[in-house]
């Protein structure tokens, strides 16, 4: 089931933002999936299909991405956290039972949500995401990456090839929409650059130290989350579970969804043995 959830910002007169949400329904424990920068909720389809028999799986397009409001006025980390909280409230996901799974930038949102709202989150899964920073060159890097896209793409096959081929390339191509001359992205370049401005000036270790729920960190052997950062996360927060998918890249949830499912399922079996996976 898909629906649009309207969320409100802080402060009088803040414009509403519309979030495109997919909800499997059901009575199982809630699993909320957060995609990375410039992505879309459909990236989680393969993983969601594996969890739907036992969990209520929810995913939504982040503000500025996919079918959600494309040019929101506020793209701060705090705004993304409010979105998670308001989606959970709108769908009446039970407080204290929510499992947050976030990849890359979605993982930062998940981390900050767990730190700020311990009453809401039962467990946290960070996929290729960690609290290191600041990253001063990140806005420029993201802008150059988006500028390199040969828009419009003539067709889905060409787009998938540009994005590296395979399941990951096809998923990125699936995030495009028809427009003049071919396929176009559903993100605005300047909005994406603004979204990472906060990362250029700070790290998130303070939030990491505030997380109280069980945590699984999934690192790809060929990804961007470095072994040293994952080790430091475990050192600062004993009990953190670290899993490595050796032959996958940063989009490990697309490269090897079966491996990610196995790691998450094993983690959840420890967190809540009564919830069958």
What are these regions (language model features)?
Residues 1-31, 53-55, 93, 265, ...:
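Alpha/beta-hydrolase fold catalytic core
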Residues 20-67:
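Conserved HGGG/HGGXW glycine-rich cap/lid loop of the alpha/beta-hydrolase fold
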């Amino acid at each position: 089931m898909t629906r649009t959830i309207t969320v409100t910002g802080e402060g009088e007169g803040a414009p509403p933002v519309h979030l495109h949400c997919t909800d499997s329904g059901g009575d199982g424990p809630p699993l909320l999936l957060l995609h990375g920068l410039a992505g879309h909720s459909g990236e989680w389809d393969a993983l969601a299909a594996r969890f739907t028999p036992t969990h209520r799986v929810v995913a939504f397009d982040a503000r500025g991405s996919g079918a959600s409001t494309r040019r929101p006025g506020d793209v701060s980390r705090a705004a993304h956290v409010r979105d998670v909280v308001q989606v959970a409230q709108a769908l009446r996901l039970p407080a204290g039972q929510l499992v947050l799974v976030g990849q890359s930038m979605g993982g930062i949102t998940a981390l900050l949500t767990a730190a700020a709202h311990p009453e809401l989150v039962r467990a946290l899964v960070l996929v290729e995401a960690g609290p290191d920073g600041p990253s001063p060159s990140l806005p420029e890097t993201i802008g150059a990456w988006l500028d390199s896209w040969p828009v419009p793409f003539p067709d889905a096959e060409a787009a998938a090839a540009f994005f590296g081929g395979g399941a990951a390339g096809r998923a990125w191509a699936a995030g495009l929409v028809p427009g003049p001359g071919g396929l176009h992205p559903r993100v605005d370049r300047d909005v994406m650059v603004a979204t990472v401005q906060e990362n250029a000036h700070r790290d998130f270790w303070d939030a990491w130290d505030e997380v109280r729920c069980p945590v699984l960190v999934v690192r790809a052997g060929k990804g961007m989350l470095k072994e040293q950062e994952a080790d430091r996360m475990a050192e600062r927060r004993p009990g953190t579970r670290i899993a490595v998918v050796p032959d996958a890249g940063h989009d490990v949830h697309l490269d090897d969804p079966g491996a990610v499912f196995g790691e998450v399922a094993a983690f959840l079996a420890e967190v809540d043995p009564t919830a069958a996976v």
